[in-house]
Amino acid sequence: MKPQNILNLIGNTPLVESVNLVKNKNVKLLLKLEGNNPGGSVKDRAAYNMIASALERGDIKKGDKLIEATSGNTGIALAMIAQLMNIEIELILPEDSTKERTQTMRAYGATVILTPAKEGIL
């Protein structure tokens, strides 16, 4: 069945039993493959819940702009979720962030502001 909305795929990731990581035969280890989220990260779930909860509480509404300091996967996930929910987002990153991260955030529609790396994220 094809999902109606990509947001419905977040957290709906496979659970796999690991047979080689645990030596104790009385232990059953299950691994949740969060890398199978639409954005490829465990951060997708957190980003979705932060934005969806803020919308539900009325803390933000469509048309508002979110501003977040980030250095990686959370920013990518926030950019993706904001785009899917039609919310503008501005992400502040240190200038030494990888080109791939900043390009991905921009590809999702985020405005990316780079700050001097030596000062960190302010």
Regions found by a protein language model. Give the residues of each.
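PLP-dependent amino-acid enzyme catalytic core
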Residues: 1-122
